Amino acid sequence: MPQLNPNPWLFIMFMSWTVFLFLMQPKLTSFISTNSPSNKNKTTLTPTPWTWPWT
């Protein structure tokens, strides 16, 4: 049985990353909405005193 050549692993790795970055990632990130902090209301939580069960 012939042995496979492990030489082009670097080329395959770079090509797979470029395919992911330039083809797949823009399509995947178009479905995800960004959570911008400017749209959030500033709510400050006031701490409530803890009621201990033995008091």
Swiss-Prot record:
Keywords: ATP synthesis, CF(0), Hydrogen ion transport, Ion transport, Membrane, Mitochondrion, Transmembrane, Transmembrane helix, Transport. One of its GO terms (molecular function) is proton transmembrane transporter activity. Pfam families: ATP-synt_8. Its main location: mitochondrion. It is a single-pass membrane protein. GO terms for biological process: proton motive force-driven ATP synthesis. The chain crosses the membrane at residues 10-32. Component of the ATP synthase complex composed at least of ATP5F1A/subunit alpha, ATP5F1B/subunit beta, ATP5MC1/subunit c (homooctomer), MT-ATP6/subunit a, MT-ATP8/subunit 8, ATP5ME/subunit e, ATP5MF/subunit f, ATP5MG/subunit g, ATP5MK/subunit k, ATP5MJ/subunit j, ATP5F1C/subunit gamma, ATP5F1D/subunit delta, ATP5F1E/subunit epsilon, ATP5PF/subunit F6, ATP5PB/subunit b, ATP5PD/subunit d, ATP5PO/subunit OSCP. Belongs to the ATPase protein 8 family. This is ATP synthase F(0) complex subunit 8. It comes from Struthio camelus (Common ostrich). The gene is MT-ATP8.
